[in-house]
Amino acid sequence: MISRILPKIVSAGLLLAASVLMYAFAPSATAQTSSSPDAKAPQLDYEFFKARVEPIFLKRRSADHARCYVCHQMAHHGGGPLSLEMLSPGATFWTEEQSRSNFKTVSKLVVPGDPDSSLLLRMPLAPEAGGLADTHQGGRQFASEDDPDWKNIKAWVMGQKAAASPAH
């Protein structure tokens, strides 16, 4: 019995360690986009993030999927790669300061201009749609790249600006 369980525990531990290392050594979006004046990577737009991406973390996707925020809040996830600010009691959205902190945290999980290398897009995407296999403990939030919320996150990763964002 133990011989069957031990490999699973070791495998889960290695996966967790790899995720932490990827996060720890991932350059921030600012570092990636400002390291050279002629960098081709787009800047991540805070206003687009706040208006179109951040609400996705609070959105209930379906009866069998919890909101991202349920697991990815600082009190629950405590320092993991996607640790969102705690909402104030009774609040339905983050304050400006909290949103800016979330932007900084979430930006570390994307490679501006490269959705295929952005963990924020690949981890919650179903493996058959191009997501990473067995990496997101909370289930697959996106069945395909055609999901409107997935497309909003991709647009942000690609440098979409709030002023140019299409209407819902």
Could you describe each region identified by the protein language model?
Residues 1-7:
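N-terminal secretory signal peptides that target proteins for export/translocation
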Residues 25-168:
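Aromatic- and Gly/Pro-enriched helix-to-coil junctions and flexible linker segments
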Residues 11-24:
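Bacterial N-terminal signal peptides
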